[in-house]
From Swiss-Prot:
Keywords: Cell inner membrane, Cell membrane, Cell shape, Cell wall biogenesis/degradation, Membrane, Peptidoglycan synthesis, Transmembrane, Transmembrane helix, Transport. The lineage of its organism: Bacteria, Bacillati, Cyanobacteriota, Cyanophyceae, Synechococcales. The gene is murJ. Involved in peptidoglycan biosynthesis. Transports lipid-linked peptidoglycan precursors from the inner to the outer leaflet of the cytoplasmic membrane. One of its GO terms (biological process) is peptidoglycan biosynthetic process. This is Probable lipid II flippase MurJ. It comes from Synechocystis sp. (strain ATCC 27184 / PCC 6803 / Kazusa).
């Protein structure tokens, strides 16, 4: 809504709501992944699901996720308008988007086999058959993703942050219930060939059912907020519709380029045994804290960026951009230190049970470490993209993403043979680093200077502190293994907690000595939250 109509909630309050709600969702997501890992390990069923989920899952994250282009476009436009203008605008955009995505759903159902063959030409016949069936079951998520993304955007614009952040747990609950009952009844038999089809259908069906529940959960709150009801509206001449599409279409295409990169990664991964499953498990562990923190940073900052788009407000906009980048570094770098230094014990704690054995843990751990190295570049890129959206420019991110397709393919080709699965992940890290660098250069020119010398100096200090903290945790873990070994889950958990604490202490002392201004800002926010609790 317009600034005058918005709630007076502070950035810290919004970030706190989003963080707590997202944390709850991520806990359920972690439980879902643990059940999947215990039931199927890194074998045939999970590999098939990893490929079948690529298109519907990507659409669900891209279009239906918080901070996606649909969410960002709606927030950017509605935050500048009065509430009475919202309902017809939202209903019109929903009608238009639903028509397009219904067609996409039909295409996915009819062409499932073709899409799987394009994504993974190296799959075994049985794995391919399961992947095709799973894709057909999950195809409706294409339509649901658009409806959910629009709903999230409208609820955020109405100053409602809890439901959009917590509703993803519904997608986890349905999978947990379905697989949980199957594991309870069948045990390890579920991962034997006679039950592979049942397991794959439970995975796909539970995922789709969760998406349906997620959409249904937002309909009533959206209507009560006066942000549109479930009705068709064809008033495409509304001025706001054009404004939304001017941001939404380039942003969707730009983000869609990431899908092409992801599909390219999986194309090369199909020639490496168990690579897709290893990437799925490693990616989830990295994305769990990343998702929580990215929502804390991106959700409250996007409306702020939008309200500072006028040239006379650019001095404050540049300050906010720096804050977004530095807060990303201060929150991501300690996680990078932990995931890189403690990759093996972390994977053992989270996944090593049932069908997921020590050999599977050894496959996933280096992949997790590689994802950990790229966390800051992923989040920093997203912060900068939101600045372009706030400025009404979806074309610049699109052009960069278009070039990144070729860069990602080249890096995948160069890295996948010598480095295996880790090489594919590092190709993605390289692409995100390149994107972030280009976006900073473009904004520096567009906003007449960003004081990049100061940025580089402070980021350099934080990188050094991160390296020292990670080495401290890694060496501490090696010493722990020599002195006590690890003979149980409890001992493994104690090792991870102890070494993570050492890493955080070293990092905290290091950043305090580095005297980065945003350290005090982050500390003040955390202290205020602690006092409220």
């Amino acid at each position: 809504m317009s600034p005058s109509g918005k709630s007076s909630r502070s950035l810290a309050n919004i970030a706190g709501i989003v963080a707590i709600a997202t944390l709850i969702s991520k806990v359920f997501g972690l439980l879902r992944e643990q059940i999947i890992a215990a039931a199927f390990g890194v074998g045939t069923v999970v590999t098939a699901y990893a490929y079948a989920y690529v298109i519907p899952g990507f659409l669900f994250i891209l279009l239906g996720g918080i901070n996606g282009p649909f969410h960002s476009a709606l927030v950017s436009v509605l935050s500048k308008r009065d509430r009475e203008e919202a309902a017809p605008l939202v209903e019109t955009v929903t009608t238009l988007v639903s028509g397009v995505l219904l067609g996409v759903t039909i295409i996915l159902v009819l062409g499932a086999g073709i899409f799987i063959d394009l994504l993974a030409p190296g799959l075994e016949p049985e794995t391919r058959r399961m992947a095709v069936q799973q894709l057909q079951i999950m195809a409706p998520m294409a339509l649901l993703s658009g409806l959910i993304g629009i709903g999230f955007g409208t609820l955020n614009a109405a100053d409602q942050y809890l439901l959009p952040s917590i509703s993803p747990l519904l997608s986890s609950i349905t999978v947990i219930l379905g697989l949980g009952v199957a594991v309870w009844q069948l045990g390890q038999q579920l991962n034997t060939e006679p039950y592979w089809l049942l397991g794959s259908l439970l995975l796909a069906g539970g995922t789709t059912a969760g998406a349906v529940l997620q959409w249904l959960a937002q309909i009533v709150p959206q209507a009560k907020a006066g942000m549109g009801k479930l009705r068709l509206r064809f008033n495409f001449a509304l001025p706001g519709v054009k404004e939304v599409l001017q941001v939404m279409i380039p942003a969707t295409l730009s983000s869609g380029m990431l899908y092409i990169n992801f599909a390219t990664n999986l194309f090369f991964a199909s020639f490496i045994p168990n690579a897709a499953a290893a990437m799925r498990y490693g990616n989830f562990v990295a994305l769990t804290p990343l998702g929580i923190i990215s929502n804390m940073i991106l959700v409250p900052f996007l409306p702020v960026f939008s309200r500072l788009a006028d040239p006379q407000d650019w001095p404050e906009l540049k300050l906010r951009i720096r804050q977004g980048i530095m807060l990303s570094a201060l929150t991501m770098f300690p996680l990078t230190a932990i995931l890189v230094g403690l990759a093996i014990p972390i994977v053992q704690v989270i996944y090593e049970r049932g069908a997921f054995d020590a050999e599977a843990a050894a496959e996933v751990a280096p992949v997790l470490a590689a994802y950990g190295l790229g966390m800051f570049f992923y989040l920093g890129r997203d912060v900068l993209v939101r600045v372009f959206y706030a400025l009404g420019d979806g074309n610049s991110p699109f052009k960069v993403s278009l070039f990144n397709i070729f860069l990602n393919g080249l890096l995948d080709y160069l890295f996948y043979k010598p480095f295996g699965t880790v090489g594919i992940v590092m190709a993605t890290v390289g692409v995100n680093l390149f994107s972030m660098t280009i976006f900073i250069w473009m904004l520096n020119r567009r906003l007449a200077g960003l004081s990049l010398g100061g940025w580089a100096m402070d980021l350099g200090k934080l990188v050094g502190v991160t390296a020292i903290a990670s080495v401290a945790g890694w060496q501490g873990s090696v010493l722990w293994q020599r002195l006590w070994g690890v003979n149980s889950l409890v001992e493994n958990i104690l090792e991870v907690l102890t070494m993570s604490s050492i890493i955080l202490v070293v990092f905290t002392v290091g950043v305090a000595l580095a005297k980065v201004p945003e350290v005090d800002l982050l500390g003040d926010r955390l202290w205020k939250k602690f006092k409220r609790v």
